[in-house]
A protein has these predicted regions:
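Midchain, well-structured core segments that form catalytic/ion-binding scaffolds
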Residues: 84, 90-106, 141-144, 148-219
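Beta-strand secondary-structure signal
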Residues: 52, 68-70, 134, 183-185, ...
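Active-site metal-coordination/substrate-binding segment of hydrolases
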Residues: 61-137, 141-143, 148-159
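Acidic/His- and Gly-rich active-site-bordering loop/insert found
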Residues: 4-99
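Generic secondary-structure signature for well-ordered alpha-helical cores
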Residues: 5, 13-21, 37-41, 124-131, ...
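Alpha-helical scaffold segments in soluble metabolic enzymes
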Residues: 11-14, 31-34, 118-121, 150, ...
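Catalytic cores of large soluble enzymes that bind and process phosphate-bearing ligands
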Residues: 4, 20-24, 28, 107-111, ...
């Protein structure tokens, strides 16, 4: 029989075969919706492209608290200089050496393809004993969070939520980092240059990732 690891790999490779750059998740969004329908699972695809999939609890656990598994379907796409690659149409070529996965000349998309594939594998596992499960796959996590921003709060009706986008294998992070983005406009008119120009620089500060280094209280 197919093991969970084999099913996980199969699902991940199926995602790699679909271009899913941020802001261009139409194909993978439809794929996930169709996949759920074929599995006999209740699925919703909202106007933003988010996909919400529900699986009832296993026998005897239908009334247990619901657990949400959340992952994002977009990826950051980069490729080697000089490589002929179209991120909107070309697929990721995965290299598996038996120990690790990497992509040929491009980013792999493990963030967060691994999370999406894991949720898919859990949803189709008929041997597991579980309460109701809801998978929420959002778009545009890497560049704006528009998927999460436009998600109808009614889909968050659950006692537990597990985000499948953590950085360390075999560990859990009981926390969350957030961010705000603003776009400001001001009308301006050009003036003839005059006077002296000065350059002011603020440097030598120590920064860090807003999520991974937030506890260090850096500048």
């Amino acid at each position: 029989s197919t093991t969970m690891n084999e099913k996980l790999m199969e699902n991940f490779l199926s995602l790699c075969a679909i271009p899913h750059k941020s802001h261009h998740e139409e194909k993978i969004s439809r794929f996930l919706y169709d996949w759920a329908v074929k599995k006999g699972l209740a699925a919703v695809r909202d106007e933003e492209g988010n996909v919400i999939i529900d699986k009832p609890g296993s026998a005897g656990h239908e009334d247990a608290p619901r657990t949400i598994l959340q992952a994002h379907m977009d990826m950051v796409v980069v490729w080697e200089d000089g490589m002929d690659f179209d991120p909107l149409n070309d697929t990721i070529t995965v290299i598996n050496d038996g120990k690790t996965l990497k992509a040929k000349g491009t980013s792999l998309g493990g963030d967060d393809g691994a999370g999406v594939a894991l949720a898919m594998s859990i949803l189709e596992d008929e041997s597991a004993v579980h309460g109701p499960i809801r998978a929420i796959f959002t778009v545009d996590e890497e560049d704006g969070m528009s998927g999460a921003d436009h998600l109808d709060p009614k889909h968050l009706d659950a006692k537990y939520l597990i985000n499948l986008d953590w950085e360390e294998f075999g560990s859990l992070c009981n926390s969350s980092a957030g961010s705000d983005m603003y776009r400001m406009h001001r009308a301006a008119e050009w003036e003839a240059a005059s006077g002296k120009a000065y350059k002011i620089a603020v440097s030598g500060l120590v920064g860090g990732h807003s999520g991974a280094s937030i506890h260090l209280k850096l500048a």
